[in-house]
């Protein structure tokens, strides 16, 4: 998926079920000039990603009605969506979660709570890295 030109605002989809965390991420990203789309669960996430075609997805793994891994699996099955970079942001730190994340080639995993500096560095890196 081609990146938007430097003159246009990049869109980040925040998929987070906790309304406080979702609003916090939205505020921090908007303050940096990003356009922010929001989803609170797996079903709405897939609808929003199809509609918005974001430049990057921030994905919480602990979602109601299908976890973040389900969202990832569905995204990767749709060619035009599979190239969208995904950053995992999660409070999970168990070995099974780490194993699944590693197997999917997802890095870095941003541990909650994530500082603005770490968040923005990860976003910039992901947006500058060519797909594939």
Q: Where are each of the predicted segments found?
A:
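Alpha4 helix (beta4-alpha4-beta5 surface) of REC/receiver domains from two-component response regulators
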Residues: 70, 93-110, 121
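Active-site beta3 strand of CheY-like receiver
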Residues: 52-58, 63
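Non-catalytic signal-transmission and effector/linker regions of two-component phosphorelay proteins
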Residues: 1-13, 117-132
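The feature encodes the CheY-like receiver
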Residues: 64, 82, 94, 113
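Conserved acidic carboxylate
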Residues: 16
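Two-component/phosphorelay signaling modules centered on CheY-like receiver
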Residues: 19-37, 104, 116
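Acidic catalytic/metal-coordinating carboxylates
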Residues: 41, 67-73
């Amino acid at each position: 998926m081609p990146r938007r030109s430097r003159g246009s605002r990049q869109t980040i989809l925040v998929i987070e079920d906790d309304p406080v965390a979702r609003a916090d991420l939205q505020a921090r990203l908007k303050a940096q000039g990003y356009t922010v789309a929001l989803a609170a669960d797996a079903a709405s996430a897939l609808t929003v990603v199809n509609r918005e075609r974001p430049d990057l997805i921030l994905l919480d793994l602990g979602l109601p009605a299908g976890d973040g891994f389900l969202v990832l699996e569905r995204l990767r099955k749709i060619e035009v969506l599979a190239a969208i970079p995904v950053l995992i942001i999660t409070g999970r730190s168990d070995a099974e979660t780490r194993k699944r994340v590693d197997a999917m080639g997802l890095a870095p995993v941003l541990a909650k709570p994530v500082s603005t500096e770490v968040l923005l560095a990860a976003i910039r890196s992901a947006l500058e890295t060519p797909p594939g």
